[in-house]
C-alpha cells in the first residue's frame, strides 16, 4: 500500500525539502581548492564482500568463496602494511642498563618489557600472517595447477580470481620490502630479548617463548625472508611455472589494454610482473624464464622500459630492472640496456608533457562543463524533458574524465618515485640529510611550476566532477542498466537461440553458462520472460519488439563480478561462437569492466586523486634516524612557498591546491593508517605552514598594492622618462591575480573552515600600522627637510589602504593614523609628527639654517654654533615600507632628493597638509614661546651689556670726511663690538633664531592664504558665488546660505517630497542631507573678517617686547626731541651690529656674517626696531646708510677693494631692510601720525625748545584721546599731558585685535608714551589674502 504524501505527515517533509532546494547554499566564491568530502549515504556499497553470493546459482560460486577469503586477507594485510610502514622505534626513548651492578636494573628491564611487549606481539602476528598468506596463496596455485589443461593452456579460474592473486603477491612484495627497510624492528626486538633474558626466571613458558623469539629474530634479521619462503613453497608445487605465467600475462594484458582506473591498480600490475618472474626463475635449467614458452620476455621488456621506476608505498619506490636482475637467469641481451638513463625516462618528468596536458585539460573541462550545463537546463525545463546528449555519451565523457585523472595522478606519483630513485648528489649542495637531496634540491623551479599546475588541474577537475555527481549518478545508473539489459535481452538472447539451434545436444556447459548469465542479470519489463513469437507463414523471420524498463537500478558488486566472470568464461570459448557474437561479448566486457568505478563515482575520484604519498617520508626518517623533518623539506610546503615566491601571476590562484595535499595526508593517517600521532604531526606542520603562508601572502598582497599605489602616485611624464632611460617598464604595477584569492571566506583544511579574507584583513591592519610607524620613525630620525618624504609616504599608505579596502574590511585610515601618530593617546593628544616638527623648528631649524630672501628658502648654515643634535636612530631600511620595490624607491628618492637641501614653501605646504589647521596653534605657540625665552633669557642681558659698551659719542661724521674717513671713523668706534667674544655664537646666533622663526611664520601664513583661496575657488560655485554676483552683492540682513544653490535646491526638493509622501520612502534621510548642506555652506562660506596668522604672530611678538621695551628705548633726550650725538636706544646698537656685519673679511676663505646667519638676522633686527617704534630714526642715523649716502654724494668714488666690498654688503642689507620694513608695515602699520610744530626760541639764549602740538584733523585728536584713556586705565602711574609730549621715544604701533583665536597678548609694560618724528608713515597697502566676503 502506497502512502500519499499529500494526505500524510510526510507531505510536510516533502514541502520542507522543496524549500531547501531554493536556498542558496553556494556563494559566489571561486573554487580554488579541492572539493571538501561530504557526509552521505553511498548507495553502491562495495563492502559486502560477496556475502550475497548465495542468491546467484553459478558454477563460479565456489570461486567467490576463495575471493572472499582473499579479500579478508588483503584487508588484514593492509593493516600490517600500515603498521610496519608507520612503525617508530620505541627503544630510542627507553632507559638502558649501563652496568651490571646498577641498582634499578630490574625496574628498568620490567619497564622495557612492559612497553615493548605489545609491539613485539604485533611483530609476531605479522610473522604468522605472512606464513598463513603464503600458505593460502600456494593452496590456490596448487588448486589451479590441478585444473591446468596443457593442450589448451587454460585453467579453471576467472580474471577476477587472478586479479586477487595479483593483489596477494603485491601484498607480500610490499610487506617484504617494508620489513627490509625498517631496521628499528630489530632494534626494538633486541631490547625486548635483553629484557626477556633477564626476567626469564620470573616468567612461565620461557622455552616456548624462546623458540618463538628465535623464529621472530630470524624472520626480522634475514632480508627478503618473505619472498624466499614464498619462492621455496612455490617450487614444491607441480606445474606452478605454468600457472604463474598466466598471472604475468594477465598483468601485461591489463597494462596494454589500460584495463585499470586507479593509479594503485596500475602500479600493482607493474610491481607484480617482475616479482612473479623472480619467483618462477631458479638456478636449475627446468625453471628458466628465458626458456618458458608461456613467457614473452620482449613483451615484458617493453613495459619495463616504459615504466622503469614504480612507486612502492609512501616514499618508497622500486626499480623494475633491479627486481628482474635478481633472477638467476637474467640475460641483459634479452632484456636490453638499462632504462634508468634512457630517453623513455623523460616521460617521468611532467614538464615535458605539460603543454599537451594543459590543452587536454582545457578541452575536457569545457566539454564536461557544457554537458553538465545542458543537463541542468533540461532538468529545469521539466522532469520528462529529453536530455540534449545521449546517455551513453554522458557515460563515455564521465569515464574519460576518470581516465584522465588516473593518468595525471599516475604521472605525479611516478615522477615522485623517479625523484626518489635519482637524488641530487651535487657535492656543492648543503644538504643536512638525504631527504633534502630527493625532494628539496631535486626539483627545479620549472619542475615545481609544472607540478603545481598539474596538481591544480587534477584537483579542480575532480572537484567539478564530484560537484556534478548527484546530477550524473542517476543517469549513469540508468545507462548501465540499459546497456546490461540490451546485452542480455537482445544480444545474449539471440546468441542463446543461435547456439541452441546449432548445437541441440552438445556443449551443455556453454548453454548453462549463458543461461546463468541471463538469469543473473535480466530485468524483464513485465517481470517474467515473454513467450517467443510464432513466425508468420509468409516469412520465417520473427520481428520482436523488446521492451526494456527504464530503471536506475545497477547490478550489485557481487552480481557485477559474476556477470564479468561468466562473460570472460564465454570469451575463453571463442571457437564456439561466431565473430559477431564474440565481438558482442568483447564489447560488453570492455564496457562492463568500468561499471564499478562509475557506480561509485565519488569514492573512485577520491581514490584516484589521492596524492598523500607526496608527503609521507617514513623510509627517509628511518634512513636518516630522525623523528621528523623540518617543513622546509616537505613537498607540499615547498610547492606552496614556490607559488608565493614566484613572479608568475597565474600560479597564485593555485595556492591552496598544494596545501590541500595535507587533507589527503590526514585522511590516510586517520582512516587508512589509523595512526593518531601521524595526524598530530600533520596538523602541527600544517599549522606552521599556514602561519608562514599568512605571513608571506600578507606581505605579498601588501607589496602588490603598495607598488600599485606608488605607480599611481608617481608623476606620469617623470615615470615615462625614467622607464625610457633606466627601468624599462619596471615602474608599472606587476600583473597579479589576487582578486580570486582575496575573496575566499571559507578555505577547508583538515576539516576546518578558515576565513582567509578575515585573517588577511587582520594582518593588513597590522602592516598598515607598521608602515605608518616606519614612516613616522624615519621622519623622527631626520631633520625638517624630510617632511616632504613623510607626506609622500603617508599619501602612498593612504592610497594603499584605499586599494586594500576594496577587498578587506579594515579599520578607517584616520583612526589608524591617529593611533600610530599617538594623537589620541592618554600620553599626548598632539601627535608624534607635530611634536617632532616643533622640536626641529626650535632645536635645528631656527639656530642652524640661513634664510635667503630672493629664493625664499632656508638652507643649512655652513657653520653652526650649536652642539650636534641627537635624534632617534634611523630604522632599518625596508624597501616594501618605502614605496614597494627598489625601482620605485629609486624613482621616488630622485624626486624627494630635490627637497632635501633646503626648507621652503613646499615643506611648509607639507606641514600644513599633514598636521592640519587644528595643530597650528600648538606649533605657533611653541615657536613664540621659544622667541620669548630667547629675548628674555639670552638677548636681554647681551643687549644691555652691548649698549653699555657702545661709544660715548656716535655722532655721524660730516660729508667732508668722505667715505674713507667716515668708514675709518666707524671702524675705530666699533672695534670693541667687532671683537666681542660672544658676538657670533650668542648675540647674532640669537638674532638669527628670532628672525628665522618670524620668517617661518610669514611663509606659513602665505601658504595658509593660498590654501584658503584654492578651497574658496572650489566651493564658490556651490555657494552661488561668481565674479558677477560677487561684485553686485549688497549688504543684507538675510542669511546668504538660504540663497546658495547647494542648500536651496535640496530644500526645495525636501519640501516637494514632504507634500507627496507616497513618493519619498525615507524622508528622514533627505532631511539629514538638507542639514548637512546647511553645515557645509556655513563651513565653506568665507567670513567678512580677513584672518592672518602672521598678523597675530606679530601682535604677540609686540607684546613679548613689552618686557624689554623700557630698557631698549633708552633715556629721554636732553633737548626733548632727539639725541643726535649719542643714544642708548636699540636702533643705535643694531646700527653698530649692522656695520660689523658689513665689515669686509680679512681672509677670503672666511665666511661673512651674512653667509653664516642669512637674512633671518635682518628680520630679527628690523622687527625689533619696528615694534620698538624706532624705524625712521634707524633709517636716519644708521651708520651704513650714512656711508652709502656719503659715497653717493661724493664726486669721486672710492676704488679700494675693502670699501667696495663694504658698499656692496651695505647696499644688500639696506635693500633687505626696506623689504622687511615694507612687509611689517603692511601687516602691522604704526598708529596715525601727528605733526610736530617746532617754534623758534624767544631769545637766542633759550635753553630748550617749546613744543606745542596742534591737531589738524578732529578725527586724529579723538583717536589719540581714546588711546590715552586706554593707557591710563592699564597703568595708573602714567602721567603727563597729551599736548606736551617728550620726544625721547615714539610709541610703538599698537597690535591689531586678535582675529585668529590665539590668546590675547599680556598687558603692555609701563612706559611713557611720546610722539616723535617716527610716528609718520604712509597709509599701508591692503593685505593680500582671500577675496573680501560679500557684505551681509
Swiss-Prot record:
It comes from the Eukaryota. One of its GO terms (cellular component) is cell leading edge. Residues 1290-1308, 1321-1336 have a biased composition (Pro residues). Disruption phenotype: Cells have no developmental defects, but cells are abnormally large and show a highly motile phenotype. One of its GO terms (biological process) is pseudopodium assembly. GO terms for molecular function: RNA 7-methylguanosine cap binding; small GTPase binding. Residues 1262-1289 have a biased composition (Low complexity). Disulfide bonds: none annotated. Residues 1262-1336 are annotated as: Disordered. Part of a Scar/WAVE complex containing brk1, scrA, abiA, pirA and napA. Belongs to the CYFIP family. Involved in regulation of actin and microtubule organization. PANTHER family: CYTOPLASMIC FMR1-INTERACTING PROTEIN-RELATED (PTHR12195). This is Protein pirA. It comes from Dictyostelium discoideum. The gene is pirA.
